[in-house]
């Protein structure tokens, strides 16, 4: 078995749940108790995307691409049978590993019993039984077999096999995946539901299903139902194995592992002095953890990882986020411009709600930093930055022209807050006296985001962009003033998740890249 590459920084880190690639699992038979347990878990963690009735129409579905699976239609992509129907093991594997290349996260941290309960509950939503026959081999003259596709022993991948595989790839795969496997062949495609789809770039190592050779073999033979990827015409055996080995050679195990969402324990040492700036030397005492990110609206050209460090002094927590970004999007002066941003999300209970901004009745506390808010604190961001040759009107009866303002809110500060609606109402964004690029927020699911009152805004954040990378520090006291913030204490373990926005790719609001829940372990 291949040992998975774990994306860690220097120092110790604990992987929770672990990778599921190639693991053999023992199915649990359905029972009323197990199905009920699956139903409860489904309503908490799955319904926000897949919908309460499993029709792929949950409240978060509009934010996601590819779209969530419709469990009622029961047309599954990852199958290992000639009938193109998933086995229980297929469904268990998809739940455990997630589906890289989509917003379907991995759930290896859920107990196996709970995941089997999900398998049986999801099957109960289908409008037809998921049935397949006893295993039989396809006839010698061609055609298909029945039941689970038998995988013969893997042969040696020698030069002759590689040449044969290259010929097969050109004949049957390059038309969609491109001559070099970059997904640049026939790109105008739709799935069975009428949604746009595109061929996989095989060189990036982003596999929806288990990338083990046996699983890839079965997908080459069975295809991906509901997509333009058909059941293969190649004879099972040598040709299918040659294609499997050829395709897997286009990417590395490290690439394939980096597309999986993994759960880590983020150790948070106790120090006497907390760093206040991203470049402070105290950060050397914190072990970096590289967390994998997934875009909710998937794109291959994505920010793959965010590196997290955390420290505390017994009274206050400091978190450092670092990620690579080729563009410094720190202004949003034009309608087509979007800013870069980052956020830290805390669950308020040990058993966290849905990782996508919480659930009704189960709040999450969000600390958010925005690059344009930080730029505003440094200098007045005027339209002339975007349009350097624009003409500007200046009127003698005004106190100052825009270019003569000593700071962004100079004119606003001379006004009565009663007549500046946002400021007067306590909107933290409209406050001209604001000296912080952070916002302390609360949410109970999609569409519920709100800011804490101005007097409860205690989170401080500062970001630096250098060498095509962001470095952002968040700080807040352990005990918040208000009742809605996360309460921290030495020795506690707190569920935490992270998000990054890339303005140059149109990220804004719910269009972002996120992690799954991690564990923040505060040293005593």
Q: Where are the model-predicted features located?
A:
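Periplasmic/extracellular electron-transfer cofactor-ligation site
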Residues: 33, 39-66, 101-103, 125-131, ...
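Bacterial N-terminal signal peptides
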Residues: 7-17
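Short, well-ordered beta-strand segments enriched in hydrophobic/aromatic residues
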Residues: 316-323, 470-478
